[in-house]
Amino acid sequence: MSDFDSNPFADPDLNNPFKDPSVTQVTRNVPPGLDEYNPFSDSRTPPPGNVKMPNVPSTQPAIMKPTEEHPAYTQIAKEHALAQAELLKRQEELERKAAELDRREREMQNLSQHGRKNNWPPLPGNFPVGPCFYQDFSVDIPVEFQKTVKIMYYLWMFHAVTLFLNIFGCLAWFCVDPSRGVDFGLSILWFLLFTPCSFVCWYRPLYGAFRSDSSFRFFVFFFVYICQFAVHVLQAAGFHNWGNCGWISSLTGLNQSIPVGIMMIIIAALFTASAVISLVMFKKVHGLYRTTGASFEKAQQEFATGVMSNKTVQTAAANAASTAATSAAQNAFKGNQI
C-alpha cells in the first residue's frame, strides 16, 4: 500500500510487472489472435532479400512446332507445270513429224508430176556421165530407220576411203621392197572393184529394203553383207601378196622401214575398225529386220512375183512357149503327111 502513497509525479509503469522488457518481448513475438486482428494495420512482411534462384536449363516446349511444309497447292502447281511441259514437248514432236510428212508428200507430188531424177553420185552438170541412182533419206526412208541407213552409208564411204589409203600404203611398201609389186597392183584392183560393188550389192539392197519393206531385199543384203564382213576380216589380217596393208603386212613393213610400217599400221587399224563396225551394224539391222514383220515366206513370194512381173522374163517365156507350140505343130503336120 505504500506504493500508492508514493509520489504522484513518478512513472506509473516503473513498478508494473507487465511492463517488464523481457515479458513484452515474448508477448510481442506471439502472433496476434483473432480478437486482436486489425485489418487496417500495416502487417506486410518485409520483402525477402535477394535470393539466388538455381539456374534451370531451358527445355523445349511439350508441343513441338511442326516442320514447315509446302502447301498442297504448291505441289499441284508443280505437277501441273510438269504435265504442261510434257504436253508441249509432245506437241512440238507431233508438229515436227507432221511438217516432215507434209514435206515428203509435197516432194512425192512433185516427183509424180515431173518424174524422179537420179541424184547420186552428185556429179557436175557438164560431166559426160550423169547420176545413176536416186537417193533421199528424208523422202524414201521412214523416220525411225533413217539413222541406221545413214550410218551404213557412212560405213560404205569409210571403207572406200580406207581402200584408197591402202593404195598409198602398198605403194610405200613397194618403194622400200621392190618385191611387193603384186600387193600394189592388187590394192588398185580392190579399190576399183569393191567400192562400186559394195555400194550396189549390199548398200542399195539395204536402202531398198527399208524404203519398201522388202523381205527379199533384206535377204539379199544379209547374204552379201556376210561376204563383205569376211572381206573386212581378211583385209585387216593383211596376208602377203593379197594387196592389203593388214597387221601381218604392217609388221613386215615395220621391220624394213619404220615410217612405212607406221603408215601401214594406221591402215590396218582402219580395216579393223571397218570389220568391228560392220559386225555391230549387222546385228542392229538384223534386229530392225525382225521388227518389220519380214520373213522368208514373204521373200519367196516377192521373188516369185518379181520374176513373173519382169518384162524380160515374160518375153523370154512367151518366146519359149511360141517356139514350143510351133515345133509341136510342125511335128504334128509332118506326122499327118506321113
UniProtKB/Swiss-Prot annotation:
Q: Which residues carry this modification: Phosphoserine?
A: S2
Q: Which GO terms describe its biological process?
A: establishment of localization in cell; exocytosis; protein transport
What Gene Ontology terms describe where this protein resides (cellular component)? membrane; recycling endosome membrane; synaptic vesicle membrane; trans-Golgi network; zymogen granule membrane
Describe its membrane topology: Multi-pass membrane protein
Which locations, inside or outside the cell, does it occupy?
Golgi apparatus, trans-Golgi network membrane; Recycling endosome membrane
InterPro entries according to UniProt: SCAMP (IPR007273)
**Residue numbers spanned by region Disordered:** 1-63
Q: Where's it mainly located?
A: Golgi
Give ranges for the Cytoplasmic compartment.
Answer: 2-155, 203-217, 283-338
| Modified positions (N-acetylserine) in chain numbering | S2
Q: Modified residue Phosphothreonine is at which positions?
A: T45
Q: Which residues cross the membrane?
A: 156-176, 182-202, 218-238, 262-282
Q: Quaternary form? A: Interacts with SYNRG, ITSN1 and SLC9A7.
This chain's function reads:
Functions in post-Golgi recycling pathways. Acts as a recycling carrier to the cell surface.
The family annotation for this protein states: Belongs to the SCAMP family.
* Protein's recorded name: Secretory carrier-associated membrane protein 1
